[in-house]
Amino acid sequence: MSAPLSIEQDDLLTDDLKSWLSDIDFSNDNEEAIEMEPSDIEMSSPPIDIETSPPEEADVNLDDTWATVQKNGNNKLNRFILTFFPSDMDTKWLEPETYFENSPNKFDCWTGQYEYCPDTGKLHAHIYIECNHKHRIRFNVFHREIRKYHQSVQLQLAKRASKKQRQSAINYVTADFKRAPGSLVFRWEHNKFPSDFDPKCVNKKSKSDKVSKDEQHETQRLWIESKPRHWTWDQIVHENEESKKLLFGCTAGEKYHKGRHAEDARRTINDVIIFYGAGGTGKTTEAQAWGSEDEPVQECRYYRRNPDDGAFWGGGRTCYKGQRIVHYEEFAGQEAFGRLKEVCDIGKHGPAVNVKNGGALLNHDTVIFTSNIHPAGWFHKLWESDPKQWMPFERRITQVRFYPSHRADGSLNQPDENNPPYFIDQTEEFRQFVGDYDKAKEHAELHWPLKEAPEPTAQVFVPGRSHGVTENTFFEYCKTGRAP
């Protein structure tokens, strides 16, 4: 008489068997596929899912749970892994003759071993079985015969039929590290093909070596976070061999790294500083060192606005990356006046700007100008035609330094290790202009005169043209030898 009809499953085994399925899901190419009768292929691997097992205490009637596989109960079995929980490690439970008569005609392979579940410690058997195509057994018949001897029975059908699938399944049910102590692998003497463990076919995605996607993403995120924000993505990826291996296929990492500046709070523009005067007096060096006490890494705090970039604020490695100091070097009015007022608007946040292949928000608190020209000459044509435009610029200035060509003692103003840059603070003098551009020009004439407007260039007649061509006077002198 068969045992009571209750089906119990161990937690083992859902994870264990699903792992096997994912590990051996190889493509079924023609070279490795095992030949089947066309009518058999569809029926050989019915899609039966493993479901969560009911508690052991519950006595579930078989009819209640059979509905999940009843529609496939008449399907014929082909390749599958059998799992059951025997009462002991008697070898007979691993032999097909225990369950079926005339087994050599029914099966082509029957190989397995006893194992202990690492979590629950329960004894169970894993057996890989291949049925003979001409004498395949139906699912419900096979299940019923095994249930006569064991209470908990699970069948997991293979999704593919290939040599790789076969060897992977054999490796799964004969692995040494999982075998129960004191037991041996059972290899049926009537197997139609070798059923030995093949180390060359060990699955690279074994459960012990798997790293979930979440863990991998977290490792990548922490690696990116450990690098300075001003680094480019290429610098992070190619830092060393470990970074190349970790981030080679990380397509989202570059976008994540670019967005790290969003964590910084928006800064308010507080200072607009002007360093003007003679060349070689240390203006640029002072600008680059500004704020180094708070942030020693220059790339993190300092950005030099390159007038050659035009409307763009850099790109790639030269792109603006949220630095708090913006430096206009050798400034002579190259920036549009309206845009400059936005960049220097005290008490406001920086405007949005264009960067190559994207955009950015200026997040600076300090603007520094270094120039060999007095500030009154930067937009002199605009201010001479409309003097009232000087006031919006002047009220934004918070500090002015003049770097003369000579020191107070008459020596050249050339800074070195023993002589720091010499400058004169003219902040109060600029405040006395009170928006009067004429006073600014007078101040320039007194301290650092503006250059006179260049003389008009000569008009050179070119035969075949109806109008003169503007030509540099020096170029004309070189060609003719005569003063223009």
Swiss-Prot record:
It is found in: Host nucleus. Coiled coil: none annotated. A motif (Nuclear localization signal) lies at residues 146-153. GO terms for biological process: DNA replication; viral DNA genome replication. Keywords: DNA replication, Host nucleus, Viral DNA replication. GO terms for cellular component: host cell nucleus. InterPro entries: P-loop_NTPase. Plays an essential for the replication of viral DNA. Presumably cleaves viral genomic dsRNA replicative form to initiate rolling circle replication. This is Replication-associated protein. It comes from Chaetoceros protobacilladnavirus 2 (Chaetoceros sp. DNA virus 7).
